[in-house]
């Protein structure tokens, strides 16, 4: 059957709510359409060779971007120093004793710098006592004042703290109203700079006089109305917003500052930092970067999103300080911070990389997901091979012979539903499995378990040698590229399909011949000591030049005993660092002795964090700070218990309104602390419930109040009803009943 492909790439500019993902294309003329393919958007954009702008020292190896040194008390930040670790307190800043105790706990856990929210004069006065007490207790850890809306407060606290963080989105413009403001005349837009300079200059001069540092920290969700009107909530707007303030600093010969470009969406975050670095190269600037994914959430999901954003930038040599923002106690942020920093430093010190090549695949200004071809059904197939891959991103699981000894347990670990003991694919079921060894033909029970998986679309992949030793009907053979080329590019006898195993060290000539191989997918598994990010970029570029559209899954392996956080951090940094560029169609994580269910959920977490495939409710929850108006961890867990079964729905849980409404750009619904003792509920950025006391809640549709006085103890129920009213609710599935398996 002749195969043809409609288009070779799709592009989307990242901005608010950018959820368009382009990937697999249906094959024209295929006898049977690929699953879910009819709904795919056809975007006809020609492939072009890209002149990749310089945003890092090298796209072929990890080399630290050279920066000046910024002094923050006793801590030096910049490329000549190790990556500094940061966190932020969650106590009420006015509670001096509690804040001092938490700062000490964070410093003892490894924090180099600690940020404290300072929202008013009372908090600023408390900061004097906090700094004084910490010095008395022998702690000289630098403190950073987190300032929003209050230039006068920033002037006060600069007397006490070593660094001031200002948000360009609200420092001079005041509190956000999300009103649309149109500047038809560019001169009018430029005239507003004078107001910014008038408000900001006194702080610049004071920091310069006292030797204080500053972070110009743009947040994707809290850009000023003026910037939004001109640039939209785009990475370009984020960078321009920061540069307006940096220009004022430079005008007064003040250079002791760093930049940050935070967003809750890792793709937006990565693009913004790359653009920031690119523009600094163009201007000849060398200011350090503080990295962070804001509102990352908690647990494994929060660590994964942070690793995707922070880790991918560290692999390009970007980043001088980092913070992993988790909805957990701040000292728990230190472990993932250390793991990420160590990963970046190792990549730099060991010179991870590949020989230079001409890169034509990536575009750092837009998100472009590489297009692959889904498997097609063939005449005579006894099994349906279309579900072998998933159009939004594929997850494979590595299964051992020992796993087959308990079939029902295996089915559950693969995420399958059980009906009368029989497996059926669910929304988060592994798409296919990989086995290094196959059961002998005499092992009827194990082979029956595999057959049941095959019959519901969970296909079995195995090395060609293993398949030759123990033939399995319908199995997919795995061969190296060299083996496949030597075999004429066809699947070996006894195999229904062929999968390629790549390791990133293949020659240019071998990769140029990949199109001649009739394979349904390739597994890319780089060996130890080889940079996965850089070698994979080379492979994808070579595959593109060869004219092949073979889907590629990242196969990452870990040694026995690897800590779970290490699995998450490295997977997010190495594989997520490729998926944010659209390079890859899924993942398989293999770790000897590790729980299969953990590896599967981590793989799906990787795809969801990379904005590819949603299999569970997405939570955008802030890490809490002194502004937080309720117990974030407790409330987030309450909401998760009631809404965690809604794949495709994103819910923001924000402690206050500083960034809350804005950072909900990617969320469908929001639960935000509006004032002490009050909660606001949102649909998108539209308030639908506002001013709800802790013992009551108000409801809004658009920006119009429609209900007031809902008791706090029913706040989660009000959120559930809001989801139902907007047609996004589904009932919880019935629990499985244990049933005997038919022989």
What role is predicted for each listed range?
Residues 1-24:
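N-terminal chloroplast transit peptides
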Residues 35-87, 204-210, 346-409, 641, ...:
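N-terminal amphipathic alpha-helix/helix-capping segment at the start of soluble metabolic enzymes
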Residues 58-64, 93-96, 107, 111-244, ...:
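Active-site beta->alpha loop and helix N-cap motifs at the rims of alpha/beta catalytic domains
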Residues 70-87, 91-110, 114, 119-122, ...:
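N-terminal glycine-rich anion-binding loops that anchor highly charged ligand groups
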Residues 85, 146, 216, 259, ...:
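Conserved, mostly hydrophobic/aromatic
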Residues 182-200, 226-389, 473-478, 484-488, ...:
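Catalytic alpha/beta core domains of metabolic enzymes, predominantly
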Residues 385-413, 421, 631-676:
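C-terminal accessory/binding modules appended to enzymatic or scaffolding proteins
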Residues 683-714:
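Thr-biased low-complexity repeat/linker tracts and other Thr-enriched repetitive architectures
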């Amino acid at each position: 059957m002749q195969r043809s492909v409609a288009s070779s790439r799709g592009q989307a500019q990242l901005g608010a709510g950018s959820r368009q993902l382009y990937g697999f294309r249906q094959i024209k003329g295929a006898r049977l359409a690929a699953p879910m393919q009819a709904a795919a958007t056809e975007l006809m954009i020609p492939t072009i060779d890209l002149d990749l702008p310089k945003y890092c020292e090298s796209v072929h190896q990890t080399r630290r971007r050279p920066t000046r040194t910024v002094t923050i008390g006793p801590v030096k930040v910049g490329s000549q120093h190790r990556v500094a670790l940061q966190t932020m307190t969650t106590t009420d800043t006015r509670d001096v004793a509690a804040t001092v105790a938490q700062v000490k706990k964070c410093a003892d856990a490894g924090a180099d710098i600690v940020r404290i929210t300072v929202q008013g004069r009372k908090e600023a006065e408390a900061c004097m006592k906090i700094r004084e007490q910490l010095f008395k207790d022998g702690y000289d850890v630098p403190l950073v004042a987190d300032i929003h809306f209050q230039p006068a407060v920033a002037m006060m606290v600069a007397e006490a703290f070593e660094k001031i963080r200002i948000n360009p989105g609200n420092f001079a413009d005041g509190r956000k109203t999300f009103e649309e403001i149109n500047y038809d005349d560019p001169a009018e837009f430029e005239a507003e700079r004078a107001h910014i300079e008038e408000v900001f200059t006194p702080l610049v001069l004071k920091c310069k006089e006292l030797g204080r540092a500053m972070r110009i920290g743009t947040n994707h969700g809290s850009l000023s109305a003026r910037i939004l009107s001109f640039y939209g909530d785009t990475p370009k707007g984020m960078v321009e917003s920061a540069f307006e303030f940096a220009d004022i600093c430079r005008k007064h010969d003040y250079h002791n500052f760093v930049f940050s470009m935070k967003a809750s969406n890792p793709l937006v975050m990565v693009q913004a930092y790359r653009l920031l670095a690119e523009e600094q190269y163009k201007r000849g600037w060398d200011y350090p970067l503080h990295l962070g994914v804001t509102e990352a959430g908690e647990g494994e999901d929060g660590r994964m999103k942070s690793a995707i954003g922070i880790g991918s930038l560290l692999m390009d040599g970007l980043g001088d300080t980092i913070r992993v923002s988790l909805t957990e106690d701040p000292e728990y942020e230190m472990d993932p911070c250390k793991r990420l920093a160590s990963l970046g430093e190792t990549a730099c010190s060991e010179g991870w990389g590949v020989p230079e090549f001409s890169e034509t695949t990536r575009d750092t200004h837009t998100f472009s997901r590489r297009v692959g071809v889904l498997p097609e059904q063939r005449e005579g197939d006894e099994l349906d091979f279309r579900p072998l891959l998933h159009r939004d991103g594929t997850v494979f699981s590595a299964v051992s012979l020992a796993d087959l000894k308990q079939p029902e347990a295996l089915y559950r670990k693969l995420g399958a539903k059980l009906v009368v003991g029989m497996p059926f694919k669910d929304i988060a079921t592994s798409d296919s499995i990989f086995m290094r060894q196959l059961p002998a033909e005499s092992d009827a029970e194990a082979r029956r378990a595999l057959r049941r998986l095959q019959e519901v679309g969970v296909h079995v992949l195995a090395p060609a040698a293993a398949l030759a030793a123990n033939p399995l009907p319908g199995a997919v053979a795995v061969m190296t590229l060299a083996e496949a080329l030597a075999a004429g590019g066809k699947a070996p006898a006894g195999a229904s399909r062929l999968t390629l195993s790549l390791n990133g060290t293949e020659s240019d000539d071998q990769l140029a011949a990949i199109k001649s191989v009739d394979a349904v997918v390739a597994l890319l598994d780089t060996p130890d000591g080889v940079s996965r990010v850089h070698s994979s970029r080379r492979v994808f570029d070579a595959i593109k030049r060869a004219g092949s559209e073979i889907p590629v899954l990242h196969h990452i392996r870990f040694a026995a005993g690897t800590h779970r956080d290490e699995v998450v951090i490295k997977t997010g940094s190495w594989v997520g660092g490729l998926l944010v560029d659209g390079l890859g169609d899924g993942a398989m994580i293999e770790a000897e002795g590790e729980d299969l269910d953990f590896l599967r959920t981590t793989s799906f977490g990787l795809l969801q964090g990379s904005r590819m495939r949603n299999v569970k409710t997405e939570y955008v929850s802030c890490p809490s700070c002194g502004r937080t108006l309720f117990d974030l961890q407790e409330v987030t867990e309450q909401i998760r218990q009631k809404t965690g079964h809604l794949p495709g729905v994103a819910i923001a849980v924000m402690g206050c309104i500083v960034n809350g409404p804005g950072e909900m750009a990617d969320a469908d619904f929001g639960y935000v602390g509006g004032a002490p003792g009050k909660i606001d509920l949102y649909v998108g950025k539209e308030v639908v419930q506002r001013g709800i006391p802790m013992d009551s809640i108000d409801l809004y549709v658009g920006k119009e109040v429609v209900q007031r006085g809902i008791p706090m103890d029913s706040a989660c129920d009000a959120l559930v009803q809001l989801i139902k009213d907007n047609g996004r609710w589904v009932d919880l599935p019935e629990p499985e009943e244990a049933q005997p398996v038919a022989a």
